[in-house]
């Protein structure tokens, strides 16, 4: 059974290891995953997280959801769910599961994502850049189509 752990601004993300807290609870034990906000309930906690795939079900670029609350920035009142690639090549162990974003999409984020250019970020998402997008951070509004530097 999978469970969710709360991380990055307090939003639930799918976890493949560790122990469960209240964010992993569900109303019945018949559900196989709580990766989606709609399946997170208040009872029947699972003690461990064993699921390694399937967390991306129902994800997509865009699409607003009312789950969660406004982050510390207070800039947005809704959240966008998406599937992010596995960014472990850049040193983070976060799984490629559904997450709830804390920022609006940008070209340096998931739409043009390539796993080899991922950078870890906050709020459970990853900043992912095209192969030769040489912006130093994902807060830049424009991505470079080609590299002027030998290493991106």
Swiss-Prot record:
One of its GO terms (cellular component) is keratin filament. Sequence repeats lie at residues 27-36, 37-46, 47-56. The keyword RNA-binding does not apply. The modification N-acetylalanine is found at residue 2. Keywords: Acetylation, Keratin, Repeat. The keyword Coiled coil does not apply. The source of this keratin is lincoln wool. The keratin products of mammalian epidermal derivatives such as wool and hair consist of microfibrils embedded in a rigid matrix of other proteins. The matrix proteins include the high-sulfur and high-tyrosine keratins, having molecular weights of 6-20 kDa, whereas the microfibrils contain the larger, low-sulfur keratins (40-56 kDa). This is Keratin, high-sulfur matrix protein, B2C.
